[in-house]
Design a protein with these regions (language model features):
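Conserved hydrolase catalytic core segment
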Residues: 92-138
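Conserved acidic catalytic loop of the alpha/beta-hydrolase fold
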Residues: 77-95
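Catalytic active-site module of serine/aspartate enzymes centered on a nucleophile-bearing elbow/loop
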Residues: 268-310
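Conserved alpha/beta-hydrolase "acid-adjacent" motif
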Residues: 252-258
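N-terminal cap/lid segment of alpha/beta-hydrolase-fold proteins
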Residues: 1-20
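Short beta-strand/loop motif that positions the catalytic acidic residue
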Residues: 239, 245-247, 251
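Conserved HGGG/HGGXW glycine-rich cap/lid loop of the alpha/beta-hydrolase fold
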Residues: 14-66
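Alpha/beta-hydrolase
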Residues: 140-234
Length: 310
């Protein structure tokens, strides 16, 4: 995927790597990868984006892949880099979507770039830790034990977290070389997620992403974990642009309590709940199509409902 690599220099002098997919003249959507991840996270059948008239732009969040690290970054700092990419490409208005650990960063863009973001989507996104209605026990409830361990390492600080993540990354590289579907073998995933991991599309993206996401070390992963469990730097109740919240009821990586909290607290949001899906969705091509159609045109996904603060 080296031919896809593009870079820019941010106003503070960092290198930021990104890639473009689909209809390069289409409606721009900036997609923010999960934790960990990189710019290669996307649906591998690029024609889907072109058919929808969407120009999908992915980037390596600071510290991942080919992007320079930004130590001490907060979730609220991600809009700086999203704005830099949009300015570089001449996008005045655009959609933003983020999945899993990218979800909070998409919400940050919705909150802090209201003059640029048309609509945003938070897909199986993490909720803020320790907020009213979602204390630490509730935030951790239902999470796989492997996830809980990672949270505890992050709470202990970078000195504990970094070597543990480095060991996990080395293990992931070994597994992906043998069989990408085993990358999450230590997790007690739902049947839906186990089935998704075994699909050719998912295995392709897992292989590409893991080989690329930590070429410069695990600094991006470390910084994501620390940012997500810390105060985000903004409140979701200031969001004024339309937001789609989607979550699955069998998710053990970001349990449904997170989606429920976001649905109850993000003003004016649309909510799509999948009773079968876990973290990886039940029909990714259909779900991505619905999500991008909504981001680009405002057509609501089937069976979505207005949140309580609509």
């Amino acid at each position: 995927m080296g031919e896809r690599l593009r870079t820019l220099e941010t106003p503070d002098g960092r290198v930021l790597a990104y890639a473009m997919w689909g209809d390069l003249d289409g409606f721009p959507v900036l997609a923010l990868h999960g934790t960990p991840g990189c710019r290669l996270e996307r649906w591998p059948h690029e024609e889907l984006y072109a058919e929808l008239g969407v120009c999908l732009v992915t980037h390596d969040r600071a510290g991942y892949g080919r992007s320079d690290r930004r130590r001490g970054r907060r979730v609220a700092d991600e809009p700086d880099d999203v704005r830099a990419i949009a300015d570089e490409l001449g996008f005045d208005r655009f959609g933003v979507t983020g999945g899993s650990g990218g979800g909070p960063h998409a919400l940050a863009c919705a909150a802090l770039l209201p003059d640029r973001v048309v609509r945003a989507a938070c897909i199986v996104g993490v909720a803020p830790l320790g907020t009213p209605g979602l204390d630490e026990d509730a935030w951790l409830a239902g999470q796989d034990p492997e996830n809980v361990k990672e949270v505890r390492w992050a709470q202990a600080g970078e000195g504990v977290l970094a070597p543990q993540l480095e060991a996990l990354f080395q293990q992931a590289q070994v597994r992906v070389a043998a069989d990408p579907s085993t990358v999450l073998a230590d997790f007690e995933l739902s049947e839906s997620d186990q089935a998704q991991l075994a699909t050719p599309e998912r295995m392709q993206v897992i292989r590409e992403s893991i080989l690329e996401q930590a070429v410069g070390g695990v600094g991006g992963w470390v910084d994501d974990d620390l940012a997500i469990i810390s105060p985000w730097g903004f409140d979701v109740d200031v969001i004024s642009v339309p937001v789609l919240i989607r979550y699955g009821l069998t998710d053990v990586l970001v349990p449904p309590a997170h989606g429920e909290w976001l649905a109850a607290n993000v003003p004016g949001c649309l909510v799509k709940v999948d009773g079968v899906a876990g973290h990886l969705g039940s029909d990714p091509a259909e779900e991505i199509s619905e999500q991008l159609l909504w981001l680009s045109t405002g057509v609501a996904p089937p069976e979505s409902t207005a949140g309580p603060r609509a």
